[in-house]
Curated annotation (Swiss-Prot):
This is Glucose-1-phosphate adenylyltransferase. The gene is glgC. The lineage of its organism: Bacteria, Pseudomonadati, Pseudomonadota, Gammaproteobacteria, Enterobacterales. It comes from the Bacteria. GO terms for biological process: glycogen biosynthetic process. Homotetramer. PROSITE patterns: ADP_GLC_PYROPHOSPH_1, ADP_GLC_PYROPHOSPH_2, ADP_GLC_PYROPHOSPH_3. NCBIfam families: glgC (TIGR02091), PRK00725.1 (NF001947), PRK00844.1 (NF002023). The keyword Transferase applies. The keyword Lipid metabolism does not apply.
Amino acid sequence: MVRFESTDSLMLARQLPNKTVALILAGGRGSRLKDLTATRAKPAVHFGGKFRIIDFALSNCLNSGVRRIGVITQYQSHTLVQHIQRGWSFLNEEMNEFVDLLPAQQRLSTEQWYKGTADAVCQNLDIIRRYDAEYIVILAGDHIYKMDYSRMLLDHVEKGAECTVACIPVPISEGSEFGIMEVTADYQITAFYEKPANPPPIPGDPSNALASMGIYIFNADYLFKLLEEDNNTPGSSHDFGKDIIPQLTARKVVWAHPFDLSCVTSNAELPPYWRDVGTLDAYWRANLDLASVTPELDMYDRAWPIRTHMEPLPPAKFVQDRSGSHGMTMNSLVSGGCIVSGSVVVHSVLFPRVRVNSFCTIDSSLLLPDVHVGRSCRLRRCIIDRACHIPEGMVIGENADEDSARFYRSEGGVVLVTRDMLAKLEAK
């Protein structure tokens, strides 16, 4: 393990991002989000009133000084590509800064789509090699968090690792949903299990397991060698978590990086924030948490801004209707272009250009862009997908049986409403 003096570490931390390329894996479908990802990839799903999920990984790269980024796409990529072209085209190519879109193109002789996360990178090796980077940061494009990758890069170099995996403790009951690792006292990974049925607990902490965050740093030449080996291995699923990382443990070249060392937070009293919003319930909770008095994720931190495509929209407006009832909101996020007329919005998130007509009550709900709510509606614990028109007088979220028959109701009782569901209901 290489040790640097503090001044050397500071200089190195500033230099490493310039020697690095980030690859964001953004081709996932996100099937557990049900119909919310029927027409868009999970990284393109709306979040937090005005953002897309992928904006967090992209913003982390820029804020960390990593300004060479490749975005690997596959499933339903049009919305994602459009968002990146509109909102992330400001980098300076003359300064060797870019966000490069890498769609699935059946590059290899097998003429197949990406078979796994490692294969997605492998099929783009000819492009990635031309980036001429010393280090490759591989990121999932579908997680919500703020992280300084330069700190993880420094940890990677100081330990002399060939590969470093970011990790975070998760409840042992949820361990089967993640890649779980066992580590030594100095965080060398000795074993790695992808979604094990019986995850091993952290020594001394039987209630938690140490989970992979799906964030990897590789020395570039070593990664290229690994991917070529894996591509020629019969029976491999060509996945980082299932194939690449487990085999590195025997070689003693892979280390874990605790997330709390590089987590960006404006409140040291709060635990490190990282969310895999892979289910409707998790997605709903993470959005509504932003509307709380003290959210776990600080979106107002000017030192670590989350960037996105900014539409030229007017401010939100709350007006009284003809009867004199005032539009009002409490503990909610309301985005630009919204109009609330003579209705009450409580603990909800209204995305851009939402229109709520008179005599409505919106409670604990997410209304995605361009939703139109007719008069006298009651919506509770709902996710209303983009451009839905809720008919006058409709009640959602108060009768579980009715909701399940008309829409999709999650295990946690959150109701997802889409345009197709409304069209089928209207056709009956």
